[in-house]
Amino acid sequence: MTDEEVLSEFRASEALLEGHFMLSSGRHSGHYLQCARVLMNPERAGRLAMALAQKLPRELRGEIDVVVSPAMGGLIIGHEMGRALGKDAIFLERPDGEFHLRRGFRLEPGAKVLMVEDVVTTGLSSREAIEAVKREGGEVVAEVSLVDRSAGEADLGVPYYALVEINFPTFANGEVPEGLARIPVTKPGSRAK
């Protein structure tokens, strides 16, 4: 799947939003990718997951024991990656602000884990999720996401593969351009309060 084909899937599902958004990373942006919309169609979600699975080197695909994704954003694409790879897919939750496995999910000691996210911007959530997998006894061997918004700068400490790289400018508090600052802020991400 080419970058343009991926973006076409986002446009077709009205998943590319414009406005003033506070991202989960705490940074501001004039654009937001609502991956839940692009993944709401099971056929589209399956196509995207198959294309994402093909980004992984063959030897790495053979190494994976289980797919883990952080709730909420990673749930659907994580499940579809499990299907694409023929592996179980489980997820992490933040009941107290820190990621944990719940609902009877567990990892076998030393399990080789593929971490799956919808979007990576700074990599903070990914690093927290990877740390949670370590606490649970697993080893993250790679991470994948539908979208890399980090401009290739996210250091996750593991090999990282994205289906597409999209570089919308983001701004720290106090650095938001005047035109963007005039638009009311929406907090659509997983850390929205």
Curated annotation (Swiss-Prot):
Pathway per the UniProt entry: Pyrimidine metabolism; UMP biosynthesis via de novo pathway; UMP from orotate: step 1/2
Pfam (any one): Pribosyltran
Listed EC numbers: 2.4.2.10
Enzyme class, broadest EC rank: transferase
CDD domains per UniProt: PRTases_typeI
Gene3D superfamilies reported for this sequence: 3.40.50.2020
Keyword Magnesium: yes
Alphabetized GO MF terms: magnesium ion binding; orotate phosphoribosyltransferase activity
Cofactor(s) the protein requires to work: Mg(2+)
Any one Gene Ontology BP term: pyrimidine nucleobase biosynthetic process
Alphabetized UniProt keyword annotations: Glycosyltransferase, Magnesium, Pyrimidine biosynthesis, Transferase
Protein residues bound to orotate: 121, 149
Superkingdom per UniProt: Bacteria
Reactions listed under catalytic activity: orotidine 5'-phosphate + diphosphate = orotate + 5-phospho-alpha-D-ribose 1-diphosphate
Annotated binding of 5-phospho-alpha-D-ribose 1-diphosphate, by residue: 117-125
Protein role: Catalyzes the transfer of a ribosyl phosphate group from 5-phosphoribose 1-diphosphate to orotate, leading to the formation of orotidine monophosphate (OMP).
Family: Belongs to the purine/pyrimidine phosphoribosyltransferase family. PyrE subfamily.
Subunit structure: Homodimer.
Protein name: Orotate phosphoribosyltransferase
Organism: Erythrobacter litoralis (strain HTCC2594)
Organismal lineage: Bacteria, Pseudomonadati, Pseudomonadota, Alphaproteobacteria, Sphingomonadales
